[in-house]
Curated annotation (Swiss-Prot):
InterPro entries: RecX_HTH_1st, RecX_HTH_2nd, RecX_HTH_3rd, Regulatory_RecX, WH-like_DNA-bd_sf
Major location (coarse): cytoplasm
HAMAP family attached to this UniProt entry: RecX
Localization in the cell: Cytoplasm
Region (Disordered): 1-21
Gene name of this polypeptide: recX
Function as written in the Swiss-Prot or TrEMBL entry: Modulates RecA activity.
Lineage top rank: taxon: Bacteria
Pfam families per UniProt: RecX_HTH1, RecX_HTH2, RecX_HTH3
Cross-referenced NCBIfam families: PRK00117.2-1 (NF001054)
Protein name: Regulatory protein RecX
GO biological process: regulation of DNA repair
GO cellular component terms, semicolon-separated: cytoplasm
Family stated for the protein in its record: Belongs to the RecX family.
């Protein structure tokens, strides 16, 4: 036997256990999370509730996690993908945000919900919009499923290109 066979060629390192803060930061790097959502994900990954809350508090204090920033991004993202204010408000509620944070995020949106509804109808039914009653119903159903209010639905389905 030669000496070369006795030398280990590569040592395997055991992966180091991540701290709760590191795990939370790993989640935040991928996308924004609300405090409640981040805490829930950490506890689902086997981290104790107190440690998860402490990690989230530390990251919030450092500026890595911010419920207001999360809410504003979510409102903008959902509005740009064709969802209305009712849907967006409900989704923000499912992420554990309080009514004040939801109201602030909705107020920060600079777009026009009625124009978003019109754009969605234009994309689905062409530039001329829904032509007959059946198409108007389909357009209204689409907008209602997407979370637009009645006024926006009426204005979008009776679309006038000169408007």
């Amino acid at each position: 036997m030669s000496d070369a066979e006795d030398i280990p060629t590569g040592r395997k390192r055991r992966p180091r256990e991540q701290t709760p803060v590191q795990r939370a930061l790993g989640l935040l790097v991928r996308r924004e999370h609300s405090r409640k959502e981040l805490t829930r994900k950490l506890t689902a990954r086997g981290i104790e509730d107190e440690a998860a809350q402490a990690a989230v508090a530390k990251l919030t204090e450092a500026g890595w996690q911010d419920d207001a920033r999360f809410a504003e991004n979510l409102v903008r993202m959902r509005a740009n993908t064709g969802y209305g204010p009712i849907h967006v408000r409900a989704e923000l509620g499912t992420h554990g945000l309080d009514s004040e944070a939801i109201a602030a995020a909705m107020d920060s949106y600079e777009g026009d919900w009625q124009e978003n509804a019109r754009d969605l109808v234009r994309r689905r039914f062409g530039e001329t919009g829904p032509q007959d009653l059946a198409q108007r119903r389909k357009a209204a159903d689409l907008l209602a499923r997407r979370g637009f209010d009645g006024d926006s639905i009426r204005r979008a389905t009776r679309y006038d290109p000169d408007d």
